[in-house]
Amino acid sequence: MSEDSIISLQNVNKWFGDFHVLKDVDLQVKKKERIVVCGPSGSGKSTMIRCINRLEEHQEGTIIVDGIELTGNLKNIDSVRKEVGMVFQQFNLFPHLSVKENITLAPIWVKKMPKAEAEELAMQQLEIVKIPEQADKYPGQLSGGQQQRVAVARSLVFDPKLVLMDEPLGALDKNLRESMQYEIKHIHESIGVTVVYVTHDQTEALTMSNRIAVFNDGKVQQLSSPDELYERPVNSFVAEFIGENNTFGGEVIDVAGDKCKVKLNSGAEIFANPIVAKAKGEKTTVSLRPERALIDPQTTMDNNHKGKIEEVIYHGDHTRLRVDLLGNKQFILKVPNSSSGMDIKAGKEINIGWNSIDCRALDPK
């Protein structure tokens, strides 16, 4: 475990009966970073968080939190828990206690803090989450967003080194969820606590993180910065899961440096960047982000093909086109609505171009 890490998972395995939930998971979380663990339901992300806080016990491998290896030693586990805040999707507020009393419960009972000091800290946290005027109200008198702010304040009040957040915004509506994403991000930036944030929402992951760990099938598929993850996915699952993606199935028929030629299942040929499929004869799924393809490109691109517009959908800042291209009837283009004078309508044939460097030859699906 490096000196700048607060969490280290090494070859961690976890089973529920015969179901192998975590499979040789390796993950290092740096001090004061904001890392998002993102993946579909059942991928193992929440189980990993529960193992870190010892709500579940792993069977194999090593988990170290703040220099302490988590084993069956209850003394060690309790000392770690005193430094870890938790926020869940369910707010878990005590309905018979006021907001301030909910927040002071942990410092008074866990850290044996004097009541007056705990109440002062509670008010400081309520200022941070911008609801100090709600201190004497009860949870039932608050909106969902206000209750979640109380849950966040409660997790921070005893100055933890680490906060674990397991889908904390899942119960909120879209607008409130987006607002709270920025609030949590700004709180982290202002106080510098380490945050491990679990979500299945790809947009939330891109918004909230310094780094993203994409989980699937009990494994970390890729751990990267948001831009690296989006622009340079290492396999087909990551490319599909993070952001929108156009795909073609095919076989590599030639390779020269950072360019390969792929014969698609439709019989057409395109040029791509050999990332996973690097040898002649390898099957591949080719990945291309919608915004990387252009209509009637003004510059030379090494892929140029004709497609037919099947559907036009207005999205405010851009128009979304569904195109029949090279055997893919679900090929998506995004055209900025500042592109004036472009004749876009269903049934029209268009020229579409993109560069091979933006088109990644990944593992076959």
What are these regions (language model features)?
Residues 73-74, 97, 104-117, 128-129:
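ABC-type ATPase nucleotide-binding domains, specifically the catalytic core motifs of the NBD
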Residues 70-85, 115-116, 229-233:
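ABC ATPase NBD coupling module
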Residues 53:
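Helix-to-loop junction immediately C-terminal to a conserved catalytic motif
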Residues 78, 103-105, 120-122, 127-237:
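ABC ATPase nucleotide-binding domains
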Residues 61-72:
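Conserved ABC transporter NBD signature motif
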